């Protein structure tokens, strides 16, 4: 393992959830204690997720139900990042959404104008309420020059027993195949996710540590932003995937329970 100094010096931990802290409704052993360890050792934490099917408020409710401490300032989603991006770059432009009602509420809370006709922007998310009409309309707007923005590039969302759900990246692949338009992805691995949080908290990127189970999102965003990275082997990545990947984490640990032990000053096992 690499020297632990940079890990121990990290002041803010950006935490993936699915595959890192829990899978479905199954909380990984030691995951809640890990959050308490961060707080007890004076470290900040933010639950950082690419899952745009839920609003930030939904995550607060879900995390608390699963036993995790969580306040509003502890959650940042790709949906929230997308809303900020739209307001910064396309303020007032009419948007057609391929997304859940929760994502719709999130965008509306940021003042994003959502329309069914005359859209200049198509926004896609992880739409667990997807119907064919949404795809039809999105392709219609894209083929007529609408800008394509997507919340996250994940192909699938992991589920218990090795199952997966088609995620935003898969939906976007369909839309791109039909329209010929490639999306701009806002969530991880876009460094914007880390940069926005750094600006809001005052913690420099080099003292931020991204923790997750996916190389192409959780670890890649850290690499792109110049942050520290911890890959946990509790989710999607196995040894073969890690060895074959061009994206490499600074630290590889079994799970967040092992990370908690290190942060408490113990010896990694």
Question: Language-model segments: which ranges?
Answer:
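Asp-based, Mg2+/Mn2+-dependent phosphohydrolase catalytic module
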Residues: 1-15, 22-43, 54-76, 83-269
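Domain-scale selection of a single, long terminal region
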Residues: 46-48
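Conserved phosphate/oxyanion-binding catalytic-loop motifs
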Residues: 51
